[in-house]
Amino acid sequence: MTILALGINHKTASVNLRSKVAFDDQKRQLAFEQIQHRALAESVVILSTCNRTELYFHNAEITPREEHEDNIAWREQCFEWFAEIHQLEHNELRECIYFKQNMESARHLMRVACGLDSLILGEPQILGQVKQAYQYSENFYQSQNSHISTKLSRLFQRTFSTAKRVRSETEIGSSAVSVAYAACGLARQIFDNFGKLRFLLVGAGETIELVARYLIQHGAKNIMIANRTPQRAETLAERLNTPMQILSLSALQIGLNQADIVISSTGSPDMLISKEMVEIAQKQRQFDPMLLIDIAVPRDIDENAGELDAVYSYSVDDLQHIIQRNMAQREQAAEQAAQIVDEECKAFFEWLKQQQSSDLIKRYRQDAEQTRQELLAKALVALTSGQDSEKVLNELSYKLTNSLLHVPTQALQAMAKSGNSQGLQSFSKALKLEEQ
């Protein structure tokens, strides 16, 4: 039995190549069908994100020893299929692709799900993507009146519980390491109840979208968006499925007069919010605390605005200092997380070994029972035909003993022939035999 991980990621391949090996819904469905038709694996889970494409195969018939010729041949078959479905030359993929099997494949999957292998260390989105990949696979096999193999399913369930444990026992995801999240984290440190605050977001690009999503997730209900093109701000509000007040840049002063927190990120070459505008707003607001976070380069907000009473002003440079400090904390937490992954990985393989021994014992007993029934049937026929009962029973016991001892005897002879003294000793101990 072998679990094989095959993939490329942001560490091994360019964006261009990663885009070529991505699986959309149509290609994923085709992949499931081809893998099943070619009997490449008993089950497979396909993980495809912007930063990685990985396939986790389970094949019960392949030896787990990496150097074994069956294993090498199977890995090559999987690689050739992967190149074929993406219509890529082998040479283009060979240097970028990686293979991991059994313990290493399980450890890799757990590290991926915990965010330890992500471009942004500890990012939480990858766990949801791994869960979605598993669900896609489960849906396919159910549509075929089948299911994901027990062992591969157990690996993914163990992975999900490991990621949950890492999140609860370490600080891997507690500190913001992106500008957008750092800005929102700073706002939460200064104001504790987003639901009662009024926000002004300036811009409607990717960074502001991330900011808006974070604010909404943490209870913000009163958000204004000011943008040079109001239609783009309206599109953003629709995408977020949240009612927002849309302003043009010419109406910035109106928004400032109402805002407790201003977060700005535009591509404007000119400053948009002057110290004088903030001063006017503060008079309108009766000098209630105001937080200004400028994450634009060049600046959107006058750096001198922070000199005003009850105004807290931060720039992208301030946020970078926060991010650096938080990243150091995440790296420390990542060491703890890696230890948890190792523990859970070992625990999974202990379970796997128990399952394999149980399966082996079950098959051995089934074979023995089949032999017993066949010999018993012959003995009953002999007795019915009038043969001597003592002779029939002696023959039954003789043949049954020979049949049950045939395979173990062959194994002992093979070990003796190869000079496997350790194997002979283990066999002798297991059978409670005393050396003569």
UniProtKB/Swiss-Prot annotation:
TM annotation in the entry: none
UniProt: NADP(+) binding residues: G203, A204, G205, E206, T207, I208
Gene3D superfamilies: Glutamyl-tRNA reductase, N-terminal domain, NAD(P)-binding Rossmann-like Domain
Residues annotated to bind substrate: T49, C50, N51, R52, S118, E123, P124, Q125, Q129
The enzyme's E.C. designation: 1.2.1.70
Cited Pfam families: GlutR_dimer, GlutR_N, Shikimate_DH
Pathway given in the UniProt record: Porphyrin-containing compound metabolism; protoporphyrin-IX biosynthesis; 5-aminolevulinate from L-glutamyl-tRNA(Glu): step 1/2
Keyword Oxidoreductase in annotation: yes
Gene Ontology BP annotations: protoporphyrinogen IX biosynthetic process from glutamate
Single GO MF annotation: glutamyl-tRNA reductase activity
Signal peptide segment: none
Active site: C50 (nucleophile)
Reaction it catalyzes: (S)-4-amino-5-oxopentanoate + tRNA(Glu) + NADP(+) = L-glutamyl-tRNA(Glu) + NADPH + H(+)
PROSITE patterns: GLUTR (PS00747)
CDD domains, sorted: NAD_bind_Glutamyl_tRNA_reduct
Annotated site residues (Important for activity) in this chain: H108
Entry keyword set: NADP, Oxidoreductase, Porphyrin biosynthesis
PANTHER family to which the protein is assigned, alphabetical: GLUTAMYL-TRNA REDUCTASE
Function in brief: Catalyzes the NADPH-dependent reduction of glutamyl-tRNA(Glu) to glutamate 1-semialdehyde (GSA).
UniProt subunit comment: Homodimer.
Stated family: Belongs to the glutamyl-tRNA reductase family.
Domains (record comment): Possesses an unusual extended V-shaped dimeric structure with each monomer consisting of three distinct domains arranged along a curved 'spinal' alpha-helix. The N-terminal catalytic domain specifically recognizes the glutamate moiety of the substrate. The second domain is the NADPH-binding domain, and the third C-terminal domain is responsible for dimerization.
Miscellaneous remark of the record: During catalysis, the active site Cys acts as a nucleophile attacking the alpha-carbonyl group of tRNA-bound glutamate with the formation of a thioester intermediate between enzyme and glutamate, and the concomitant release of tRNA(Glu). The thioester intermediate is finally reduced by direct hydride transfer from NADPH, to form the product GSA.
Name listed for the protein in its UniProt record: Glutamyl-tRNA reductase
Species annotation: Actinobacillus pleuropneumoniae serotype 5b (strain L20)
Gene: hemA
